């Protein structure tokens, strides 16, 4: 696990120092951004092979923020809209990504519970954004450092390609501090 922890840590530093708004007109900044996101998606694919197989990708990650996408292609239900399981996929994995990159590899995120409220069918790819403010990240670290674990929740708004709000997710996570020993 030390190798993957080092890889997560290095990727987190690389991505957090890139400019999420970099365009091709700024080739070095754009290359840093896109290679960082490619590394994040590769780590996810190595850790959770189900994710890339089912069209999941991280589109943007920076301190306190993650945006992810799931493709409609290969994930259609019997009505031709996005399959319910794909909504869960795109709503669940970003919480782990956000936690790993904001807290660091010394903390392991675990999903405890998640609910989805479906508002309307999505007939395109679906995106979700999550954020954690600095104070919340710090509170999670302090509690996990003191007790070995901490709980937090994330709410996500899922949008289709046209910007329609198609679902809302609420996820309850627990973070465990690796190697914690109670005093």
Language model feature labels by segment:
Residues 2-32, 122-123, 133-183:
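HotDog/MaoC-like acyl-thioester-processing domains
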Residues 73-106:
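A short mixed-secondary-structure module that forms the rim of ligand-binding clefts
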Residues 52-58, 112-118, 139-141:
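Short structured motifs
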């Amino acid at each position: 696990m030390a190798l993957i922890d080092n890889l997560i840590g290095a990727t987190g530093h690389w991505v957090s120092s890139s400019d999420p708004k970099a365009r091709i007109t700024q080739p070095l900044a754009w290359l840093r951004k896109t290679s960082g996101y490619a590394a994040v998606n590769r780590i996810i694919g190595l850790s959770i092979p189900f994710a890339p197989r089912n069209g999941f990708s991280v589109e943007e990650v920076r301190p306190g923020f993650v945006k992810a996408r799931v493709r409609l292609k290969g994930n259609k239900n019997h009505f031709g809209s996005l399959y319910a399981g794909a909504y869960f996929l795109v709503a669940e994995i970003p919480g782990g990504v956000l936690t790993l990159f904001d807290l660091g590899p010394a903390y392991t995120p675990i999903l405890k519970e998640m609910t989805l409220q479906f508002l309307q069918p999505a007939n395109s790819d679906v995106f979700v954004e999550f954020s954690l403010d600095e104070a919340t990240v710090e509170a999670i670290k302090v509690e996990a450092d003191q007790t070995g674990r901490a709980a937090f929740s994330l709410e996500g708004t899922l949008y289709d390609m046209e910007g329609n709000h198609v679902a809302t997710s609420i996820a309850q996570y627990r973070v465990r501090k690796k190697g914690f020993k109670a005093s």
